[in-house]
């Protein structure tokens, strides 16, 4: 088991944290031609999307994909950048008021704000990509997004408690499944982050379910999506129209 984990770790670390944008057709080559279910679903995805940007499969892919995709969109939307920056600036105080220790979250928040300030200078895409490929910067962004998700879940614990299995409190769930690095994300994490930052996320779900079409969910329901992600069991990548 330890050897298997090590092999998976080696495979993961050989993949870029965030890749270049690629033609969506690269997905067809990832599955056997006779894998009818996936080939049909990729064809269906092609009706709506043209490109994909992959993320490293390390358990942090949802946060990294969300972070990069939204910040990339902010390079061309100064109004949303100002709104988002104001929410992000205030978020540290919100977390401290909830009981998070200021000195433990400060560095993560500072890195997050630094990156938003970089976006304000309208750098080239390569500069933003460079930040997300720098493991220390990229991981600090992931940690802060995890903290924001945890904070929102705990603030709205009355609502989210119903979705948590195993008799755990929302706080226990956050300490075990949200805040630690490499913990995979599910609907509950996506709902919380989308609402915490007021950024709509659309996820296309590509799995082995019957039928040749890909189902999607928008978080929160009925909102206008800004971030488009592809989910394959255990992993998220970024989609482009």
For each predicted feature, which ranges?
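Conserved beta-strand elements of beta-rich interaction domains across eukaryotes
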Residues: 59-60, 68, 208-210, 234-236
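Charge-dense, extended regions
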Residues: 199, 213-241
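Papain-like cysteine protease catalytic cores
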Residues: 18-22, 26-49, 70-207
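A short acidic (Asp/Glu
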Residues: 63-67, 73-74, 213-216, 240
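Eukaryotic N-terminal, low-complexity and coiled-coil-prone scaffolding/targeting segments
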Residues: 1-25
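Conserved aromatic-histidine-acidic binding/catalytic patches
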Residues: 12-15, 53-59, 177-181, 227
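Structured, charged interaction cores in eukaryotic nuclear gene-expression proteins
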Residues: 47-68, 75
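Beta-strand cores of modular interaction/reader domains in eukaryotic scaffold and signaling proteins
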Residues: 51-56, 62, 202-204, 228-230, ...
